[in-house]
Structure formats: C-alpha cells, structure tokens
UniProtKB/Swiss-Prot annotation:
Ranges: TPR repeats: 48-81, 82-115, 116-149, 157-190, 191-224, 225-258, 266-299, 300-333, 334-367, 369-401, 402-435
Compositionally skewed regions (Low complexity) per UniProt: 25-37, 864-884
Source organism of the structure: Solanum lycopersicum
Gene3D superfamilies given in the database record: 3.40.50.11380, Glycogen Phosphorylase B (3.40.50.2000), Tetratricopeptide repeat domain (1.25.40.10)
Keyword hit for Nucleus: yes
Gene that encodes the chain: SPY
Miscellaneous note of the record: Does not correspond to the procera gene.
Top-tier EC class: transferase
GO biological process, any: regulation of reactive oxygen species metabolic process
Composition bias, Polar residues: 910-931
Region (Disordered): 1-38, 864-931
GO cellular component terms, semicolon-separated: cytoplasm; nucleus
Reaction(s) this enzyme catalyzes, per UniProt: L-seryl-[protein] + UDP-N-acetyl-alpha-D-glucosamine = 3-O-(N-acetyl-beta-D-glucosaminyl)-L-seryl-[protein] + UDP + H(+); L-threonyl-[protein] + UDP-N-acetyl-alpha-D-glucosamine = 3-O-(N-acetyl-beta-D-glucosaminyl)-L-threonyl-[protein] + UDP + H(+)
Keyword Coiled coil tagged: no
Annotated protein name in UniProt: Probable UDP-N-acetylglucosamine--peptide N-acetylglucosaminyltransferase SPINDLY
C-alpha cells in the first residue's frame, strides 16, 4: 500500500500511549496482558535486555533516533524480538515514516499474530491515513486477540465515532447513529460518542434525547466544554435562559477562551435582559445587556437593546451612543438606524432623522417602519406628496400595518381631506381595534365636520370611553380628608407645557393661583422642553408648587404618583389630542376629575366628573350632549396670556395697499369646502380684496393647487390668493398678522389660539355661532373682549359682517390700533380674576365631593347596573356588535407597541402619529453545535 508521510495526530489515539511510547498494557507474544512487547519464552542475554530497556528510556525522552539505533542493533541479533519490533515501529511512526513503521508492526504481527499492541498500532496508522474501515478492522482483531485490552477498545470507539460522523455528514444519519451506539457499546465511557449523538439528536430536534447525551458526555468527561456549551443552546432555545447561562458558565470555567461559548453567553444574557425588561425591571435588563458585552464586546444586538432600554429610560444621549455602536458592529442593523431617526425627529432635527430613515431603507428597502417614519417626518414638514408616497409604500410592504393607516389619516387630515382621514382611521381600527391612536384621531377628525345635527359624535365618544375605561382599574376610595374649606391640592396634567397653543391658556392659573389654599402640582409629559417649559417650572416651584416630569412613564404609575401627592382635584388639559393621559384619568386617581381647555368636546370617559366651559361656548339650552357634567365660568372658559415675542401692532395693510386683505392662519382641516364657499362670497363682494391663508401643507405644490382649484371653482381667481407655509419662529408667525386686515374664522370648528393672536395683533376676527362647543369658541372669545358685533348667527350675517368691516378702512384702522388695549383690559386677559373664578369652581366641586355628590361614581354605578342587567339576559343568538367590542389587551398609548416613541404634529389640536422602533432584540448567533 502507498503511505503518506505525515505527523501522527495528537488526538485521542496518541493519548493512549504509555510513558515509554507503547500503548498502555502492551501484549506479549502469547496475547496475554503484561509488559509491552515483553517475550517471556525466549531467553535473551543480559546485554540485549539491558539495551532494550535503555532504548525504551530514550524513546520516552523523545530521542527516537538513538532509540531506533539500539532497537535495530538488537534486531540484528534477534530479528523476532517483539519488543524491539514494536519499539522500532513507534520510533519510525514518531519520525513521520509511516510506511516503515507499518512494516515493523507487520513483522511483529508475523511473529505473534495475536499481538494486540501491534495490531492496535497498525490501526492507528490506518486511521492516520483516513482509512477508517481498515483501522476499525485492525482494532477489532486486537480485541479479538485480547478482549480485555483497553487501548484497542478506546481506539475502536474513537474510529467508530469518526465513521459515524462521516456517515452523518454524507446524509446517512441513521447509520451514523448506529456507529455512535456501537462505539458506546465498545467503550461505555467514551464521552465524544455521547456528545456526537447529542449533536445528531439536536439537529433532529429531539432535544430531550440530545440533552441526555450531552449530560452523559459531561459525566464521563467533566472538562468537556463543548458538551456544556451545547446543553446551554438547548436550554436557551427552550426559553430557560437561567439554565442556559449556568451551562455556559460551566463551559467557560473549563475553557475560558472558548469563543463560541462566549458568544452564546452574550446571546443568552441579551435575551435575559429583554425578558426582565419586559417584566418591568429595566435596570436589571440594562445590567444583563452590559454583562453580555463583557463576553462579546462587539455583540451588536446587546448594543441595540441597550439603545432601546436607554430610550425607554429617556436617556437619549446614551441611546444614540449604543444605536451607533450597534450599527458600527452590524452595518445591516436597519433597526438601529430607524431608532436613531426617531430620537432625532423628537429633537426636531428632522434632516438628521430623514438621513437615518433613508439609511435604514438602503439596508432594508421594504422596511415598513422606516417607510412609515419617513412619511411621518414629511407630514410634519408639510411635504404631503412625499409623505403619502412613503406611507403607501409602508402599507404595500406590510398590508396589516395598522399604524400606517393611522398616519395616512393624519396626512389626509393635515391636507384638509377629513372624509379620507376618517376612512383611513377606520381602516386602522379594522386591523387593530385596540389602536388608541386611530380611535382618538377619528374622534378628533369628526369635530371638523360636526354641526350638531345629530348625536353621532357624542355616541362615538361615549362608546370609546366605555371601552377604554375597561383597560384600567379604577380607584373608588381616597384618603383625602373630606373637609370642605381646607386647602386643596390641584393637579394639572398635560404634554403641552411648552410653546404650544394650550400653554397660552394654562399660564394664568399657574401664575395666579393662591398656592396657600390651592397648591398646584404639575404633571408634565412634554416631549421636548423649551424656554417656556423652564419658565413655567420655575414659576410653579417658586410659588411652592410641585413639578413632576412624567414623559415616558406608564399611565398607571402616574396614577400612583397622583395618589401619593394627595391631589384633590385632577385637571387634564389635552382630551383626545396627542400624548394625552386619559389612561391616567381612566384610573380615577383623584377624588374629583376635570377636563378643560385642550379638546372641544366630551372626552367620553365616565371617570371624569366635570368639563369646564362657559355659557357662550355651551349655552344652557344647547342640545349637545357630554358624558361629563358641564360647569360654566362666568366669562369665557379661556384666559389668554399673550406671547412676549408678539411685537408691536402694525398699521392696517389696507392703508398702504389700497385694498383689504382677509386672512386665516387656522389649520387646513378647519377650512372645509363649506368655509371656502362663504369666503369666496365675501371676496367677490369686496372689490380688489385678497385672501391670505397660512398653514403647514402649503409647502406642497399639489395641496396648493388643490386649494386654489376649489376657490377658482367658487369664482375666486387664484391670483387674488396668497398661500403661506408654516412659519417656524413664533415672532415671525405673530408678525405675519401684519399682512391681513380682517381675520375670517372657520366653522363648524372655530379657531382658538389663532383668534386670540389675531385680536392681540390688532386684526378683528369675524366668527359665527353654532350648535356645538367647537363652533362657539370664537363666540366666547369675541364676546368676552367686547366685539359682539363681529359674532354672526348664520352664514349671511357672517358675510355681511365681513363686508361691513371692509367697507370703512378708516374705522378698520382705528379698531386695529385700539384692539390690543381693548383685549388686554378685558376678562380674556385678566389672569388674576379668571383664576379666582376657577378656584371658586374648584371649591364648589370639592364641597359636592365632601357631601357625597360625585358625578363620575354615579355614572360608573349606573354603567355597572346596566352591564349586570345585560349579562343576566340570555339572547337566542349570540352576536358581536363591533361598536361595543370589549378591548382586552393593553393600548399602544399613542406609540409603537415595542418602544413607546410618538411623533406629534405641532398644531393647536393635534393628531397622534406613530413611529416604530424595530424589534426589541435580534437573537441571531452561533448556537455552538460542535461535532
């Protein structure tokens, strides 16, 4: 046979060699077990015996050349010396001369055919050449010669295991398994046979069998690192992360530098971090993620999940660091790029956000979350065509992507197409009936077209409130002492304590409350604080109030905070607009609960006692229904604090232009076709007059063209209309009122902040009353200022009032220059008096509570009775009314289901758009199955 000269494998077989180079337990020529190669039946002279002993010593010291010379000298005298032939073969084997070694062992076998030692060495040489079958046959002959010869059994177990692995790799799995079992039968203590059986059973997904085999392998060889590693993989895949980590720890205790085990440990620790974080222990989750990086410092998934965790902890600088590290070590991690975009978007760095989303899409072109988020940014920027394209692509990529439909609804709403917006919200709700965003945005959108001709909008709010309330546990008792005239604690919760519409109407109470008798606790969920936020905080703290930053905190936890602060009357200022805390109000943490300012309709929540309004916005004889009990202030329900950045009132532009300019800075959703029809009548009746309209979507050409086309169809030439996009700086926005002479209010959803701004800048506003609160806000504002003559009862009066104002430019100019003073001296800007009035209302509410008169408790008891009566009736056929569907899962809280980020359009009354943050963790990695 042809031999290849090579090194003898330093593997399992060589470990069976004794200190003298012979296989442990070498055989005598008779086949009986004794000293290796010793021939007892042949008398040798003392010198030969001494020479062989010396040669064995030399060989044990790896002096194979010298030992070989002595063996050969002995063989010259006695060519049948078994011990010398075997010693010679071993020396040749160690010198990589396999052919000569084989000849020497063969000569020994010729002398003694039953010599197990020589047969075993021949088997080793066969195995070195990859001739596993011949090796096995040689080992079997050795065992047949001496069944108790352990080295042969060990070597046979090794080669049978190798044969089994070869068969398995060739696709003959069952034959491979058979060979492993044959190996175990030959040597029941051979750990690799058990281990490789474990690998096969793992691949066959017979994990109980695999685990049993790995355990036996580890039992036979306690230092078997690979067995511990693969046991860890099985436990990890079963979700038993603690057991998996324990196995990896044992593995690494045996082999500290075992890279696969270190990587697997990092994977398991990352999974465990995500598990405990989802269970509520985010700090422990972070600790596990960091520990994972100790085992694999470039493990991108641990870095990504640290980014997610720090984002949830509102430590956004840290989140950015770990998202960037995750992307650095895994350039295919689109989720990290996406989440970076969310953070930059929330920081108003829209260009950077777009860059991140586009990078994510370059990695995953159909990544629905980034497509959606890019659409959100474009919507915020007013780029409606680009936004629609992105969101539609997100829906194509994932047709069941509910929140994309919600965001499409926001886009349609911003573009002024309310019917399409409502359709999109309803499509979202078909996919995800529990979508809080879509449910609330739908209610908000319905206000833009509701004229109070029926109760549909009330019923929609009521039904939403009843379903939503079931998601939260309600408190029904409080420790607050029922002393009617004691000092009260008033809580205000809002996300809008920054330069935002609501902030102009909450500033007066924060500044003028009698903190001795009405201590203020502010719960601020502001996404991005600004100078106004800081001013509010300083003012409240200086007067002895409390300021709680609650952004990102679970609504139930906020409820607990409110109870700990002993709040007596809790006032929410947001309604169904973005980032609201209606979930907190649903828990009913305070004895008395109130809604005010932020939303022009009922919340629908049975847990809220009162809604603050006035007799002008909600006349006592109005037919509009509310879930809450209405409480009316003596003047307007609003108190306006002008912006210090407003600047001076400019002269009427009509004086220099020679024509009158009408205008509106309301959002496009309020400017319905019906409104445009009335405005067209006005401009047609006032020669040479112009119209100026400013809103965010006008930076989009298609929106501009659509708007002008509608006016042209109504008889108004496009050349008479000026369209302005969003103006970012507040000072510049206020100065833009210098471009108009007369402000035209919208209906049936009137302006609020825009009306106050126009009046403060000297621009009179024409408004029209109606049958619902949203329609009458302008009525409340103008009457409070003393401009009742600008309040119309119908469209004809509205047109006539505008025409009359425009007909006398001198009077218009005089009114303009006196309007700010008139407004400033009116109750609308008298913060001290307004606050005394609202404190009086709070005191009345508290007295009613002390007397046991609690509207929400009565309402909830009635609902409980109705539910009990309904459940006691067994219908003939069971059916489910979608409008009465009971929601059993937690709401998304205006955010993505995994990570809680929300995009907020910067509008007076705003819709919630959802941004997605990718998956919590990516569990890819080498599972460590070694064979």
């Amino acid at each position: 046979m042809a031999w290849t000269e090579k090194d003898v494998e330093n593997g399992k077989e060589s470990e069976s060699l004794g200190n003298n180079g012979f296989l442990k337990g070498g055989q005598s020529s008779s086949g009986s077990k004794g000293s290796p190669g010793r021939i007892s039946h042949v008398k040798k002279i003392f010198e030969d015996k001494d020479a062989i002993t010396y040669a064995n010593i030399l060989r044990s010291r790896n002096k194979f050349v010298d030992a070989l010379a002595i063996y050969e000298s002995v063989l010259e005298k006695d060519s049948k010396s078994i011990e010398s032939l075997i010693g010679k073969g071993i020396c040749l084997q160690m010198q990589n001369t396999g052919r000569l070694a084989f000849e020497s062992f063969s000569e020994a076998i010729k002398v003694d055919p039953q010599n197990a030692c020589a047969l075993t060495h021949c088997g080793i040489l066969y195995k070195d050449e990859g001739r596993l079958v011949e090796a096995a046959e040689s080992y079997e002959k050795a065992l047949k010669a001496d069944p108790s010869y352990t080295p042969a059994a060990e070597c046979l177990a090794i080669v049978l295991t190798d044969i089994g692995t070869s068969l398995k790799l060739a696709g003959n799995t069952q034959e491979g398994i058979q060979k492993y079992y044959e190996a175990i039968k030959i040597d029941s203590h051979y750990a690799p046979a058990y281990y490789n059986l474990g690998v096969v059973y793992s691949e066959m997904m017979q994990y109980d069998m695999a685990l049993n085999c790995y355990e036996k392998a580890a039992l036979e060889r306690p230092m078997y690192a690979e067995a511990y590693c693969n046991m860890g993989v099985i436990f990890k895949n079963r979700g038993d992360l603690e057991s998996a980590i324990a196995c990896y720890e044992r593995c690494l205790a045996v082999s500290p530098n075992f890279e696969i085990a270190k990587n697997n440990m990092a994977i398991a620790l990352t999974d465990l971090g995500t598990k405990v974080k989802l269970e509520g222990d985010i700090n422990q989750g972070v600790a596990y993620y960091k520990k994972a990086l100790c085992y694999n410092w470039h493990y991108a998934d641990a870095m990504y999940n640290l980014g997610v965790a720090y984002g949830e902890m509102l430590k956004f600088d840290m989140a950015i660091v770990f998202y960037e590290l995750a992307f650095h070590f895994n350039p295919h991690c689109a989720e990290a790029c996406n989440n970076l975009g969310v953070i930059y978007k929330d920081r108003d760095n829209l260009d950077k956000a777009v860059e991140c989303y586009q990078l994510a899409l370059s990695i995953k072109p159909n990544f629905s979350q980034s497509l959606n988020n890019l659409g959100v940014v474009y919507t915020v920027q007013g780029k409606m065509d680009a936004a629609a394209s992105m969101i539609e692509k997100a829906i194509i990529a994932n047709p069941t992507y509910a929140e994309a439909y919600n965001n499409l609804g926001v886009l349609y709403r911003d573009a002024g197409n309310i019917s399409l917006a409502i359709e999109a919200y309803e499509q979202c709700l078909k996919i995800d009936p529990d979508s809080r965003n879509a449910g609330q945005n739908r209610l908000l959108a319905m206000n833009y077209i509701n004229e109070g001709t029926d109760d549909k909008l009330y019923e929609a709010h009521r039904d939403w409130g009843r379903r939503f309330m079931k998601l939260y546990p309600q408190y029904t008792s409080w420790d607050n002492s029922k002393v009617p005239e004691r000092p009260l604690v008033i809580g205000y919760v809002s996300p809008d304590y920054f330069t935002h519409s609501v902030s102009y109407f909450i500033e007066a109470p924060l500044a003028h409350h009698d903190y001795t008798n009405y201590k203020v606790v502010v719960y601020s969920s502001v996404v991005k604080a600004d100078a106004k936020t800081n001013r509010f905080r300083d003012k409240v703290m200086k007067k002895g109030g409390l300021w709680r930053d609650i952004y990102g905190i679970d609504e139930k936890k906020v409820s607990s905070m409110i109870r700990e602060d002993k709040v007596d009357i809790m006032v929410e200022l947001t309604g169904h607009t973005a980032n609201n805390k209606l979930g907190t109000m649903a828990c009913r943490p305070a004895p008395v609960q109130v809604t005010w300012i932020g939303y022009p309709n009922t919340t629908g929540l049975p847990t809220i006692d009162y809604r603050i309004t006035d007799a002008m916005a909600d006349p006592p004889n109005a037919k509009q229904k509310h879930v809450e009990e209405l409480v009316r202030l003596p003047n307007s329900f609003l108190c306006y604090t002008p912006s210090p950045e407003a600047g001076p009132v400019c002269p009427a532009p009509a004086l220099s232009n020679g024509f009158v300019t009408f205008g509106s800075f309301n959002n496009l959703a309020k400017i319905t076709p019906k409104v445009l029809k009335v405005w067209a009548r006005i401009l047609s009746a006032v020669p040479h007059s112009r119209l100026i309209v400013k809103c965010k979507p006008f930076c989009c050409d298609s929106v501009r063209q659509r708007f002008l086309s509608i006016l042209e169809q109504l008889g108004l030439e496009p050349q008479r209309v000026d369209l302005l996009p969003l103006i970012l700086l507040n000072h510049d926005h206020m100065q833009a009122y210098s471009l108009m002479d007369i402000s035209l209010d919208t209906f049936p959803y009137a302006g609020t902040t825009t009306t106050c701004e126009s009046l403060y800048m000297g621009v009179p506003c024409v408004t029209m009353g109606g049958s619902v609160h949203a329609h009458n806000v302008g009525v409340s504002l103008l009457k409070t200022v003393g401009l009742e003559n600008l309040v119309a009862r119908n469209e004809d009066e509205y047109v006539e009032s505008a025409i009359q104002l425009a007909s006398d430019v001198t009077s218009l100019s005089n009114l303009r220059m006196s309007l700010r003073e008139l407004m400033s001296k009116s109750p609308l800007c008298d913060g001290a008096k307004f606050t005394r009035n609202i404190e009086s209302i709070y005191r009345s509410m508290w007295r009613r509570y002390c007397d046991g008169d609690v509207p929400s408790l009565r309402r909830m008891e009635l609902l409980q009775q109705q539910q009990t009566q309904t459940e006691s009736v067994v219908p003939e056929e069971s059916s489910v009314n979608p409008s009465e569907r009971t929601i059993t899962s937690a709401p998304t809280d205006g955010s993505i289901k995994e990570n809680g980020f929300t995009a907020v359009p910067a509008l007076a009354l705003k819709s919630s758009t959802s941004e997605e943050n990718g998956v919590q963790s990516n569990h890819n990695g080498n599972h460590g199955n070694l064979s």
